[in-house]
Amino acid sequence: LGSDSDKYNESYYAEQYSEYLKTKHNTTLLNSNNAIDVLEKSVLSTGEPLGDLSILPTWELSKLASKTVTVALSGDGGDELFFGYERFQSIANNHWLKKLPYSMKYLLWGLDRLTLNNSYINDCALYKSPGEAHFGLNSRFSDGMLNNIIPSLANITLPEEYNNYNYNPPNDINELFHRIRKAEYYGMMQKTLAKVDRASMAHGLEIRVPFLKKTMIEKVLGLGINIHQPQKFRKKILYQLLEKKMPGIQPQKKKKGFSVPLTMWIRTGLKDSFYQRLLDDQFCHTYDINKPALENILDNHINKQIDAKWPIFTLYSLAIWSKDGRVDV
């Protein structure tokens, strides 16, 4: 499954592996013209608002797979176990600044931004702790944007049980990587598993996840951190195994993520639907949304002044569910 964007389309690599393994292979491309139907159906299949735009390709891939098989394998858990996400490095690369006062961190961050485009010090350095930086990276809204769109949320605090990112400051870099990985497992990955489960079961497809087998997790955790060299590499062990098992294929080492070019689609084929759904008077009233503020963000996205696909899609998902999927009891 691919898309009409070179940035996200990985169908070429899938075709390479299929040819190497001599399997039957079909390629389908999503674009802004056929995505609108997939978008609304996929959001409704989750049974609740889900701020993860990868529900689109997951839903469509499940639909395609269910035509020929009833059970499929998923690679979920691989990025968490083997440090595949960029955010592992984004947080860890600022670890050397941990003992400096905020004013010094801000000064160094500003100098690096002006001279080297934040090549060495990123925005994570400006948070009070690695856990807060981690929470910020996984958030769909900045605090300022969320409070501007829905002012009534400004004084609401998260439940005490939501403490996934409240990990203590680590003593060393390895402990930091361990805490980040644990937070990913009990945080974002749970959302990912729910997404995959609901998208697949909407088509009667059963998904099994080898990376989350207990013996696999225990084996990888038993290897420790150093063997992965997570500050330098992502999924080092998996790439080494792949190159050994499939020497004829050059691995794709730049992670694209299982996603679609929603930034572009919102500006083109999906624009009318997003304006209609998000600026609906009843929707804005129901959720106490500051309609002019939301319209301004949507306009700025359409005009390419900002890329707000994540908050826009999250609210769009809420709007679809609220109108067509919500069941009041």
In which residue ranges do the predicted regions lie?
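Short hydrophobic-aromatic micro-motifs
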Residues: 72-74, 82, 182, 188-189, ...
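Structural motif
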Residues: 51, 171-184, 231-233, 298-315, ...
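Short Ser/Thr-interspersed hydrophobic loop/turn segments at strand-loop and sheet-helix junctions
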Residues: 184-199, 220, 317-324
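Short amphipathic alpha-helical segments and their helix-coil junctions
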Residues: 161-175, 221, 287-305, 325
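Active-site-adjacent bridging/hinge elements
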Residues: 31-38, 163-165, 190-193, 285-296
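ATP-dependent adenylate-handling active sites, centered on carboxylate activation for C-N bond formation
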Residues: 1-162, 199-246, 306, 311, ...
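PAPS-dependent sulfotransferase catalytic core
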Residues: 246-305
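Short acidic alpha-helix initiation/capping motifs at coil-to-helix transition points
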Residues: 194-197, 232-233, 275-276
